[in-house]
Amino acid sequence: MHNIHRRNFLKAAGAATAGLVTANIALSAYASSVAPKPQAGKSVIGLIAPKMDVVRVGFIGVGERGFSHVEQFCHLEGVELKAICDTHQAVLDRAVDHIVKQNRPKPAVYTGNDLSYRDLLSRDDIDIVIISTPWEWHAPMAIETMESGKHAFVEVPMALTVEECWQVVDTAERTQKNCMMMENVNYGREELMVLNMVRQGVFGELLHGEAAYIHELRWQMKEIDHKTGSWRTYWHTKRNGNLYPTHGLGPVSQYMNINRGDRFDYLTSMSSPALGRALYAKREFPADHERNQLKYINGDINTSLIKTVKGRTIMVQHDTTTPRPYSRHNLIQGTNGVFAGFPNRIAVENGGFGQSYHEWDMDMQKWYDKYDHPLWQRIGKEAEINGGHGGMDFVMLWRMIYCLRNGETLDQDVYDGASWSVVNILSEHSLNDRSNSVTFPDFTRGAWQTAKPLGIIGA
């Protein structure tokens, strides 16, 4: 310190103090957003919407992900595709052409500007809206959808801030409309089989889970003017944390009955250095290209640890940058054994097929024969034909429509969407506070303690 000139030292000290003040203000704002607010309506746990003979559907966003939903909906019975909205004419034309080729009526089309979706929402012949837009639009569009008297089905993540999560929850409770974040991985064959096994006690009392989104997506940086990379790349310059937690976390949460007898209590998070995106840009783009002018701050690998109120632990990882095979981990450990994914393998002490729990059993067929989930037994072949991430997309949409047409509760509610999505911002808060733990908001306002556990869905 003696080498620092007094004036520079005072400047440095002032800057440090200002930084601490800013950090304290941010943490104070976060702390105030954690506390439950006065309830504007009533809980939507177990919400059942009036039965619909035919579900009338509107789509906001029919580009990459949205078009895949349009394709899947064309295979479903009991639905009418009433209207679509997007800001890009080419993807609108593609969606309309596909719908007409499937011998369905031509939908109404809305475009022109970023707010054209409001014209779609003003219609009185739409029951549900499928939202597949860039992340920052998810919460506002879901809120406006419910305000317009429609059920919202939104892509992941549901929201990007704690306050947005509360706003979506509050709107669902006030309007008594469904807001389901469409976590498709919960409907994968392996994930549903494991849910079935957990509910039948195969792994004993649950202790620990591991979830991840490990998916090398640097190539999306080459999508400059349109498609996912044209907007998703910039999130690596805005935040440092787990940008995309729900694909791995959703299934593990349902195994553990999160928000239905247990809930997330607190989280701590760490990130590696942010190196890979800049290196990729340097290698793949000219030196003066915009991708080389960006400052990438999101750590290449983020690892967060969650503690539940019942004392269980969950590791959640995010890595869309390093060169490695795809994985969601999908590990669930109990007092009697463990399942782990990528590749699928099982070890149990009692109730298995004679193998030692000291070695992995990687022969899944006998486990499928015994524990394959009722949903996959019912529509698995149809799902495999129609596709969508191995069939999970079709199963999810089929199940959504089934529940709406038969007056059943959806498998995922607004509290799930908020709890799984908020890991994004909580991981950032923890990182900004030297990886100290941060508290999860209780979006159920205590109702998790009496909520009915999630059973073997669709059984």
From Swiss-Prot:
Residues annotated to bind substrate: Y213, R232, Y244, P245, T246, H247, Y326
Any one GO molecular function term: nucleotide binding
UniProt binding sites for NAD(+): E64, R65, D86, W135, E136, W137, H138, E155, V156, N184, Y244
PTM (free text): Predicted to be exported by the Tat system. The position of the signal peptide cleavage has not been experimentally proven.
Enzyme Commission number: 3.2.1.-
Keywords annotated in UniProt: Glycosidase, Hydrolase, NAD, Signal
InterPro entries: Gfo/Idh/MocA-like_OxRdtase_N, Gfo/Idh/MocA_oxidrdct_glycsds, Glyco_hydro_109_C, NAD(P)-bd_dom_sf, TAT_signal, TAT_signal_bac_arc
Name of the protein in its database record: Glycosyl hydrolase family 109 protein
Organism field: Shewanella baltica (strain OS185)
Lineage: Bacteria, Pseudomonadati, Pseudomonadota, Gammaproteobacteria, Alteromonadales
